[in-house]
Amino acid sequence: MSREKYYLTTPIFYPNGKPHIGHAYTVIATDALARFQRLDGKDVFFLTGTDEHGLKMQQTAEKEGITPQALADRNSAIFRSMTEAVGGSNDEYIRTTEPRHYASCQAIWKAMAANGDIYLDRYSGWYSVRQEAYFDESETTLGEDGVRREPLGSPVEWNEEESYFFRLSAYQDKLLALYESQPDFVGPAERRNEVMSFVKSGLKDLSISRTTFKWGVPVPGDDKHVMYVWVDALTNYITAAGYPDTKSDQWRYWPATHIIGKDIVRFHAVYWPAFLMSAGIELPKRVFAHGFLFNRGEKMSKSVGNVVDPFALIEHYGLDQVRYFFLREVPFGQDGSYSHDAIVNRTNADLANGLGNLAQRSLSMIAKNCGGVVPKRGEMTDADSAILDQAVAALTTARKAMAGQGIHLALAAIFDVVAEADRYFAGQAPWALKKTDPERMETVLWTTAELVRRVAVLCQPFIPGSAAKLLDLLAVPADKRDFVHVHADYALVPGTALPAPEGVFPRYVEQPGANA
């Protein structure tokens, strides 16, 4: 029986600088979503990569005295290593400088042109090099310093050039019909409302080529034009799915769910579906935009200089600690902030003092009192059954949450079980039962160890390394770690030899001057 396919993407990142924690956050969150669906039996294709063309890349390369391709090669390798460093389980890494991507871009361009949606004209307007976008004068402000800026603060300058245009204006009604018929096409709700408001206000035709730089995909039949970044960049999602070969096995993964930052929602929820409609290609399943991360409340930007290096953050706190903090602390889809204290408090409370402490205490007692094997399971009480049932119920809750990208809600459900298990363990007091009722002690220890097994299986998408270590300590075979194995049919078998217990979540201890 063929498994349900699930295609998940991050945006492709622009490598004119080094990765910051915002890039890492997108990969971590999308990775958790991908791992969750894999563990739930789906055939997942998870894509990330780099968007390597455009004026900024050309200018940065010129400043450094190297070619744009050399800059792209160097910096995309750093982004790829960031993806690995944050535990990304992506199936492919796409680069827009690949020959297959040129072929894909030119194919979609030709399809849109054949549909009558591309024409040549002149374009003039206020242009931001940083945003690689034109702005109406009404969208800009003139500062006291005499510099005109676009809404996000970068300088704009008046520019005029010949350009190919896409008839975006022809798609206003079709896009509104899409949002009405598929309310979940854009999420969360506030982003959907923003998109609908933007489209209802009227769509102008879109400039989709440039003559002012050469670093890009050539327009078919007119080499003095290169494709504008959004046709080029957005097309990566179908390039990786095999386009234009729509008969290939790879194409069966399309359509995708796109995870993006909220600053690029317009391009993914308006321009992209319009391009696909024009080209006769099926639309994405969903576009979900997460919020910004603020370092103690200030938005991170390479230009501001308060960017935190994700490699340094992981080295300092640990990979799973960083993953857990951002996935648990920040409601996915909303803005969030982080600080040294917030990371330490959350990870110490939930991981070191919570799940880690529960596993360490129960497994140490088993090693000491049960000969280092899974204890015997005696008669189960209602309390024993209830705590184990809660782990199964948490899977149901997590499935529902993750279907709507509610990563923080899934983790909250799982760690509610951990908190309840802590209370169960303290209330049953197996250390006291050792003297009064050793059989009951073994049943409590079995129940606690089995609970840790179930929770560890559920934690794998979020803290994969630590969850794997917990499952190793419980001697759970590698092929018995999917979500189907959370159920009682796959419970720990009494008498199974266990390795010597060891700590999985070291408690963060403050070092002088350690604040990140």
Swiss-Prot record:
Sequence motif: 'KMSKS' region, positions: 299-303
Subcellular location: Cytoplasm
Keyword Ion transport part of the UniProt annotation: no
InterPro entries xrefs: aa-tRNA-synth_I_CS, Anticodon_Met, Met-tRNA_synth, Met-tRNA_synth_2, Methionyl/Leucyl_tRNA_Synth, MetRS_core, Rossmann-like_a/b/a_fold, tRNAsynth_Ia_anticodon-bd
Primary subcellular site in the record, as a coarse category: cytoplasm
GO cellular component: cytoplasm
GO BP terms: methionyl-tRNA aminoacylation
Residues where ATP binds: K302
Quaternary structure annotation from Swiss-Prot or TrEMBL: Monomer.
Protein's UniProt name: Methionine--tRNA ligase
Organism: Mesorhizobium japonicum (strain LMG 29417 / CECT 9101 / MAFF 303099) (Mesorhizobium loti (strain MAFF 303099))
Phylogenetic placement of the source organism: Bacteria, Pseudomonadati, Pseudomonadota, Alphaproteobacteria, Hyphomicrobiales
